Regions:
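Structural and coupling elements of P-loop NTPases
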Residues: 1-554
Length: 554
């Protein structure tokens, strides 16, 4: 169901998906929800559309930190999950231990007795089978469908009551305009009928249902009528928003509004003003960037966009680095060129006291890396809650840490673990501000010339630090080209060429090599930059640069 390019590349669900399958005489509506806490806006709305849920856990890894986030929301909604232990055909799979870990998590999250008595199955999605006991034959998915019919209660809505349809997801079509997706809680809806939309402020807007669609497989099918319990997509209401209710115009009854977690992280999107501006992007002006951000608000409920004192800058807030990183990467692939600032946490006042967001951080590392992780997280105000030593030379660590303590940590974590560690985190709560957190300890290497970086200049400067670029890369004044070995920033001329004489030959460079550059992905760049630095984003390049006006375009 993950059709978005970024979803396929990252192996995560970003946008919720709807489908429906018919098993025996029952239509089963299925909604795939994101698991990562950054997409909490999607998760909470989806849980309001369903009567039950299937919790899928890995037979080897057990519940992940993002599992905790989704499960907590499901339990708060009173849902009773069916647990499916997946990938039981993998090496090192330990299905029964995974079930025990799930039970521990249920108890930790305050599940009631009925929820803790959850049904569970063993499955392999790749091989296409599910079974009630490990000793059963590997056949098909029928045991899972039977479990759904047995344990998920039928819809409680009444098709004879006045219409109540809650908007839980927004979509957009060039032909139909805004499309609202939601569940019919009561009543019946017909294509072409007049309906009323109860807005958040209580205002009632009337409109005609121009198109009514249902779900079948991975497609949408046009419907003439649908009734309570079904998930439908409706066109006709151009200004509908998440949580509002489509109802009967003669007897309007609004459902309770959906509460979504507020953003915890913010950054500034601005027009690219580097010396290379406008050379690689199709959409580069402030108007084009603003229009794209406003369009994103139509479907991305957890996002906030604010205009600033400068017409070239926009404040963008989201649920986390992944949430904002997905938006930046999507815009980049669409041809947009812009620059973004370092992510900053959003502070809140709780009971008259300034507070900041805290995260639950889970690490899976080799035993040799445990000491380095504990030391560095301690410097970032992290408190270790749990530590488990595995029998396979691996250790699982759990920390509670301020969200700002995680900004820039992933790069350090990969160095400490030599790329062998697994890191996951999810939003926990707001707590009093804890004080200063140590920032990046090394300065950066900055180009003070515009031109093309040469092997000769880079080789001479190699002992100053590590580079982010290779010879032949175009650079400009103020562009960050590497990390200094010392705490201070250092400006370099990387465009210097070798002066050839009778005693020197160009072939001499072929005998020596540069160290491999540090690759800067978008996520790594966002974590790496400091408060006086920017990430320049274009369809072709990710560059780091200084914010100082002396380096900006004249």
């Amino acid at each position: 169901m993950d059709s978005n390019d970024l979803e396929r590349e990252r192996g995560i669900t970003i946008l919720s998906k709807n489908t429906a399958v018919r098993y025996k005489d029952t239509l089963i509506n299925i909604v795939d929800t994101p698991g990562h806490a950054d997409f909490g806006g999607e998760v909470e709305r989806v849980l309001g559309m369903v009567d039950g849920c299937v919790l899928i856990v890995d037979a080897n890894e057990g519940p992940m930190p993002q599992t905790r986030f989704v499960l907590k929301k499901a339990l708060e909604k009173g849902l009773r999950p069916i647990v499916v232990v997946n990938k039981i055909d993998r090496p090192r799979a330990d299905p029964h231990t995974a079930v025990d870990k799930v039970l521990d998590l249920f108890l930790e999250l305050g599940a009631d007795d009925d929820q803790c008595d959850f049904p569970y199955l063993f499955a392999s999605g790749l091989a296409g089978f599910a079974k009630n006991e490990l000793e059963d034959e590997d056949k098909d998915m029928q045991p899972l469908f039977e479990a759904i019919l047995r344990h998920v209660p039928p819809p409680v809505g009444d098709p004879e009551k006045p219409l109540q349809l809650q908007v839980t997801t927004l979509d957009y079509s060039e032909y139909l305009g805004r499309i609202v997706i939601g569940r019919i809680h009561n009543g019946t809806i017909n294509a072409g009928q007049q309906a009323a939309l109860v807005k958040e402020d209580g205002k009632i807007v009337k409109a005609k249902i121009s198109k009514l669609m249902g779900f079948e497989g991975l497609s949408r099918v046009e419907l003439e009528q649908s009734s309570a319990g079904n998930l439908v997509a409706v066109a006709g209401f151009t200004d509908a928003n998440i949580g509002e209710t489509i109802t009967c115009p003669n007897e309007p009854r609004a459902l309770p509004l959906i509460k979504v977690d507020e953003p915890t992280l913010q950054m500034t999107f601005s027009v690219n003003d580097s010396p290379f501006c406008g050379k690689e992007g199709d959409f580069v002006t402030s108007r084009q960037i603003r229009d794209r951000l406003m369009r994103e608000l139509q479907t991305n409920v957890a996002l906030r966009v604010e205009e600033t004192d400068s017409p070239d800058k926009f404040g963008v807030s989201g649920r986390g680095e992944l949430h904002l990183g997905i938006l930046i990467e999507t815009m980049r692939r669409e041809g947009y060129e812009f620059q973004v600032s370092q992510p900053q946490v959003i502070y809140r006042e709780v009971n008259g006291q300034p507070c900041e967001p805290y995260e639950l951080l889970a690490l899976d590392v080799s035993e040799e890396a445990v000491g380095g992780c504990i030391e560095r997280l301690g410097q970032r105000k992290g408190e270790m809650q749990d530590m488990q030593m595995g029998g396979n030379g691996r250790s699982q660590l759990e920390f509670v840490i301020p969200a700002r303590g995680l900004i820039g940590f992933r790069g350090e974590f990969m160095r400490i673990t030599r790329g062998d560690g697994i890191m996951n985190h999810s939003f926990l709560d707001y707590r009093p501000i804890i004080g200063d957190i140590s920032a990046r300890r090394n300065g950066v290497l900055i180009s003070f010339e515009e031109g093309v970086a040469t092997f000769y200049a880079m080789k001479n400067a190699e002992d100053r630090g590590s580079f982010f670029i290779t010879p032949g890369t175009k650079v400009y004044k103020g562009m960050i080209v590497g990390e200094n070995n010392r705490p201070q920033d250092l400006e370099l001329n990387l465009c210097k060429t070798k002066q050839l004489t009778n005693h020197r030959a160009a072939s001499g460079d072929e005998l020596v090599q540069l160290q491999a550059p540090v690759e800067m992905s978008l996520e790594r760049a966002l974590e790496y930059i400091g408060p006086d630095e920017l990430v320049e984003v274009t369809p072709e390049s990710i560059r780091l640069r200084k914010m100082s006006k002396k380096f900006a375009r004249r």
